[in-house]
Amino acid sequence: MIIVGNGNCGVNFFLSFNKEHFTKKKLLKYIDGMSRTDFLIDHLEYGSFVKDDLKQIFNFNVLRGKSDYKYILKQITRTSLKVKKPDIILLDNWGDMNFTAWKCKKTNRRIWICNQEKREDYLNNYKQFIEDFDKCGYLSYEQSIENYKKLIKHYRRNNPNCPVIFINIYTQLWKKDYHRNFYEKIPYDLQKIIPNFFIGYVDKNKLKTHNGKPGLHFTKENYQEMFNNLKEQGFNYNLLNK
């Protein structure tokens, strides 16, 4: 089975806590995380930065040892786009919900700097950076919808009916992203216009974080409920035996 997609904690925990369903056969997973949808769409036209480019932009001496170090590197992976014929497309909405971006004036390539408001110390030369990049801010809801449509179309280019599973990220237990909670509607709007599209959702009243603290990582039971709720939407479980 080949799974492709764009996602982060939602996708990863969904697979981890439902692994008995996805590992009946050999599983090949190509998930590009820590990227917004526009980063992937842009790659098809402009390419992407590589690690050596990031070394010129970011101060890795400051970053090394921090979680943001590996996350910043992950934002340039594009393995999912190369897969010719996936069996399942797996997405979540956290990247578009969370990241603000900067766009390179010369190459039109985009990156994010960090999760915090200001981390100038992450950059080798902040003054040079703001001369070379334009601040894009957040994606709008409408931009995100269009990007998901384009991304799914690309993934489906050789398998037009490839099912999409979209893991919904809920913000009610994480105040930092609550101002972007309207992104929870995205999978429902996409489902109206994209066939063979399934939503990994859970009853919000049952939401609990895995460690009892504020966050976006939920319990095993929550992710298992997301899987079980696919069936009522018509998801063909026989695909998981492929």
Regions picked out by a protein language model, each given a short descriptive name:
Residues M1-K242:
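Extracellular glycan-modifying ectodomains
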